Amino acid sequence: GIVNVEDIPEDIKLSEQQQFAVDSAKHANEGELEIDKLAVQSFLDLLTYPLYHFDFETFQQSIPEFKGVSSYQQIPFQYSLHIDHSDDSLTHKEFLGEEGTDPRQSLVEQLVRDIPLNVTTLAFNASFEQMVLKGLAKQFPQHKDHLLNISSNIVDLAMPFQKKHYYLPEMKGKYSIKIVLPLLVPEMEKAYKDLDLIHNGGEAMQAFAMLGEMTDKDLIRRYRESLLSYCELDTLAMVKILKVLKG
């Protein structure tokens, strides 16, 4: 029988996905970057400027404290927005809810001011942002049209990696931002490690849920600053990934 991927004969019949996996494994040590330049360019052609790089942070409650929320529903409490102007200059906007309160209404009111109608918004694995926006549109019908407009104009930055139009064998067929970012923008890995208290989405979720119980004002301030720094880095990471795609 065949034990190693190297032993698979060249003439064996495989599905497209299997063939891709075999080729990737065979060339994994060669570090060959594969770019479908036409496909990447047609992705870049979807983008209009100014371009809104967008990321939500959410938390969940097993027993909901807020009106209209079900158990374990994703409740957005924070977002970061890097606005990428056509001349490569950036504007940063952000929102972080007040601890111990329902952050949704304030978040929605600022979001519809920060992201105008009919602009291109970029998110990584955009289905998550779209799910949260659609949930908010139901909960805040007065802003429904604007929120659904943002959702329908989201472009997924994961697309070129998911479709393997930009592929490194080290990705091993995976395309999450945790896989893509260190390969394309290695210096960002250190930036995340250098953050103070929050280094990933799980820590952000736990921190916001805990903040309402905290009494130490210095610690609250430190956690809030850490949350803002972490979320800002997430959208800056998207700016950097896009820059690599543009070549």
Where are these regions (language model features)?
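Conserved DEDDh/DEDDy metal-dependent 3′-5′ exonuclease domain
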Residues: H92-A204
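Hydrophobic alpha-helical membrane-insertion segments
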Residues: P64-F66, H165, K243
